[in-house]
């Protein structure tokens, strides 16, 4: 991707607009200026706390899939077996304690929409291989299942890690990185956006006042 896709210089304006619940048109205008409306996998990079999940939601809301489901899976929060069942679903009797009728995974539930894979760098090699197959042709099998399933799902992923270094170390598949990194956004940390500190502080103050039922306060210099 070109450099203009690799950085959103006004990413915090997206956060401010979302926090104030401005209409979707404003978010769409901000994103349209920085990201092509291409229905392709998107990789969001940035340090912890830069708003990667917020941006994933905004990208979904500005896409042609906006009226369809959006689901999130944090790859660092679940062990491999649970993450596999959550993403791909499982067939009846797949394991002890499985629901009698099986359970659809996020890919099935999100058909026509978007799945956001947060902390994708923490995904195990086994799950990386299953995800790669899905990205190749949209097909997958539930855990313990024999039937091939298909789903039309856009994958948005995010990471704070250097995936290229992980590829060199052998802990992340290079072919999967190519599939995930069709479009890329690099989110700058707030320390590189000092002009946004004031507006963000106002947003947080408004939120705190609303929660406590107090009149709107003002920040002093």
What are these language model-derived features?
Residues 55, 82-86, 91-94, 99-106, ...:
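Helical "lid/switch" subdomain of P-loop NTPase nucleotide-binding domains
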Residues 56, 110, 157-158, 201:
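Small-residue (primarily alanine) positions within well-ordered alpha-helices
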Residues 14-19, 23-26, 30-97, 108-124, ...:
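Conserved post-Walker A coupling segment in P-loop NTPases
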Residues 1, 6, 11, 19-27, ...:
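Nucleotide-binding/hydrolysis machinery
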Residues 119, 157-162:
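A short beta-strand-to-loop transition that corresponds to the Sensor-1 phosphate-sensing loop
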Residues 73, 138, 143:
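ATP-binding "lid"/motif region of the histidine kinase catalytic
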Residues 73, 158, 185:
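Short glycine/serine/threonine-enriched helix-capping/active-site loop
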């Amino acid at each position: 991707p070109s450099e203009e896709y690799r950085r959103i210089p006004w990413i915090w304006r997206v956060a401010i607009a979302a926090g104030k619940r401005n209409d979707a048109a404003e978010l769409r205008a901000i994103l349209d200026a920085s990201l092509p409306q291409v229905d392709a996998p998107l990789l969001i990079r940035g340090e912890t706390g830069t708003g990667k999940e917020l941006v994933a939601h905004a990208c979904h809301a500005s896409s042609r899939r906006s009226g369809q489901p959006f689901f999130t899976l944090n790859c660092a929060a679940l062990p491999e077996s649970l993450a596999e069942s959550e993403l791909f679903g499982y067939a009846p009797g797949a394991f002890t304690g499985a629901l009698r009728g099986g359970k659809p995974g996020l890919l099935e539930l999100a058909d026509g929409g978007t799945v956001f894979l947060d902390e994708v760098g923490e995904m195990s090699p086994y799950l990386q291989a299953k995800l790669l197959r899905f990205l190749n042709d949209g097909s997958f099998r539930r855990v313990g299942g024999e039937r091939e399933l298909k789903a039309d799902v856009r994958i948005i992923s995010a990471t704070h890690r250097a995936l290229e270094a992980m590829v060199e170390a052998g802990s992340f598949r290079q072919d999967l990185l190519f599939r995930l990194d069709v479009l890329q956004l690099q989110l700058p940390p707030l320390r590189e956006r000092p002009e946004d500190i004031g507006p963000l502080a106002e947003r947080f103050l408004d939120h705190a006042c609303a929660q406590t039922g107090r009149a709107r306060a003002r920040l002093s210099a």
